[in-house]
Structures are given as structure tokens and as C-alpha cells.
Amino acid sequence: MKTNFYFILLLLGVDLGYSQNTPTYYKDIAPIISENCMECHSYGGLGPFSLTNLEEVKSKIKTIIAVTKSGYMPPWQADPSFRSFENERFLDSTSIKRIENWYQTGMKKGKKKDLMNSNKLDRVKPKEDLTLFMNEAYVLSNKSEEDYRFFNIPTNLPEDTYIRSIEFIPGNKGVVHHSRIMVDTTNQIRGIDGLSEYDPKSLEYQKLPLADEFLYGWVPGNVPVLYPQGTGKKLFKNSDLILNIHYAPTSKSETDLSRIKLYFAKEKVDKEIKVLTIREGDIANQPFFIRANTKPTFYVSYSLKESINMVSIMPHMHFIGDSFKVLAVTPSGDAVPIIKIDKWDFNWQSTYLFKKPQYLPKDTIILITATYDNTISNPENPNIPPKDIAYGWDSTDEMMNFIIYYY
């Protein structure tokens, strides 16, 4: 009778390999990987391996389980319980457990029709209007240390131009660790091209004011900035882009020719994207100086001089940054959570995109709390034993910036 029962189940098309509650690749796992991993882990991407199909995911499943359970991947610093963002990459405990259950139940394939169309790589991507390359390829020759370089890239724009998006493309994903793009409208910083952060000449150039200190910041997986329709960021005629690249150590000669893609605003720009940078000079408990073997906290209380609609934000510190929190208090007393980073990681800085523009009225107070760890217990401390650290562009100096892109 038992044999006949199983025979009947097979005739009815029941899959005896798994139940309806058993996770499958197409229904449960592929959407998680697509939304949170494939931007880096794809062919030509920045991850060390691809996760674009079932076999690739199965081959790396133990690694995936380990790095997701530890919180190492996906790399996302902001606390989602404090504020959720459009471009967040975050796996909750349910998703992490689902991946592990899929492995434990035999990594069933499931039905392809169950696949949710969440793959960001399949979304229509417009063609760039202008691609700007470094003036010449930079050669790293057996450098066993971190390498921080400045490059000057003239835009040669014939007129003031509004851009709706900007994208950085590393020329050598094996050595380009992260980058930052700034704007100079004076054309007086062109001599910085190819100089190290530590070159005395570059220190002189750093004294000159910039039109934009943070046009865009890139780390692996950071999405291109896309401003809302009807808005645009103005790049002035003949302005230069200052590209700051961090190269990872290499054991052999490597070459990099990175590029920047600009996407012009096609429709009428009714609202210009502006940049507000709250910086070290706005700190209430001056001076901005971090003594060796201390963990100081700095505070900012910044009053908005106009009403704004925030499109995106970018906190910025260097290696001894430890935590960063921003809260806004409106004139009516409403508290608006902006961002909370409990454990800062210099290597995974991001531009955080709001799901919809966040309105803040004039006279709103932006409260910033930033803590630094200049002790030997900080594994990212560039100085062992610790040294006194002050403000500076160099990555071994420190900064405390909160950049707001708004209209």
C-alpha cells in the first residue's frame, strides 16, 4: 500500500525532493543575490568571483553563508533601523537564514518562472554623453604599500552643463580600491596630476579652494549618482575634475587608466542640485585635533539657512573614524533621523540615496556626532604606535565632513 501511495503522488506531479516550504534558488535565493550582490559579483564586476547563476552560487555557498552571517557582506554601513535608503544593501536575519536553509536542504533549483525580476544589471541604462579618461595610464611598479594619487582631468566643456548622473569606472579593478571626484574651476591645480598625496607639491595645491569637494565618491558596489528628473548638477565651462584614487598594494607591475562617465540632463532643469558640506570648522568643541591614545567625540549643531530637499548624503572620515550619527530637528521640534553608522569603515564609504527627497525647512538644526578611535585597539589606525592627528587631505590625516546633495 505504501508503494502505491508514492506511485500516486508521482502521477500527480508531486516533487518528493522538497516541500513547498523548502527554499529554492529561483524563488528564494536568486532575488537576494541579484539585489544585494550582483552589482559587484558579475562578469567584469569588482568582486573576486561571479554570482550570476545557480552553479556559481552553489560553488561559493559556504563562503556566502560565512560572510553574510558575520555581517562582512554585503558591505553596508548605515543602520537600516534608523533610516532606510534607496540603494541599501542589507540582509536581514530572515534572508541570511534562508540562504543557510537552502544549503542545508540540498540547494534545490526550483522553477525558473518563480524568479523575481529584481536584477539591477537588467535595468535599462542610458548611454553616457561624455567619457573622460585620465591623461595617461598610471603604472604601479611592485608597490607593497597603499598608494594614494591625484589626477587632474580637464572636462573641456564648451559651456556650463547640467549633469543628471556621474559614474566612475576603474581601469584596473584589481588595484583600484576607491576614489573621490572633486571639481576645480580655476585651472590652477593641473600640476597635481599624477602626484602622490604625500608629495610636498600636492600639499600646496590642497590649499587652493575647490568648487566642489565631493562631486562623487566611489567604492566597489557604490551606485552612480542619479539626480531626480527635472534636476541637475551644474559643471562650469572648462572646469577640471580632480580624481583622488586609492590603489591597493600589488606584488607586480600594474597599470590603471580609469575613466569618468557624465550623463547630461536631457530635459529642462528646473531645480539645480547644490552641495552643502558641513565640515571641521563647524565643530562646536574645537579644535579638531585627535591626540594619540584617545577616543574623542566631536559635535556639530548646524542651522540651515534655507529650506532644502535632500536627494543624497555622504558622511566622510578617514581611518580612525569610529562612528557617525546625524539627526535633524525642525523648527517645530520634530526629530528627523538622517543616518547612523555604528562602526565606520573607511574602505566602504557610500553615497546614500533617499527613497524620496527629504524636505527640511529653514532653521532646521542638523546635529552631528562623530567619534574617532586613535588607539592601538583600532586595527585601521595608520600609525602604530598612535600619533597625534590633525585635519588634512591625506588619508593618514583626518576629516569630518557631512555632504548633502539637495535642491
Which functions belong to the PLM regions below?
Residues 1-23:
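Bacterial Sec-dependent N-terminal signal peptides
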Residues 20-151, 240-244:
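Aromatic- and Gly/Pro-enriched helix-to-coil junctions and flexible linker segments
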Residues 58, 62-63, 71-86, 176-228:
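A surface-exposed loop-and-adjacent beta-strand signature within N-terminal beta-sandwich domains
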Residues 106-110, 248-253, 371-380:
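Short acidic/polar inter-strand loop motif in beta-rich domains
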Residues 116-175, 253-320, 380-407:
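Solvent-exposed, flexible loop/coil segments flanking beta-strands in beta-rich domains
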Residues 163-164, 233-247, 358-372:
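Noncatalytic modules at the cell exterior or secretory-pathway interfaces
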Residues 206-266:
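Beta-strand-rich globular domains of non-transmembrane regions
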Residues 312-392:
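Extended, compositionally biased non-globular segments
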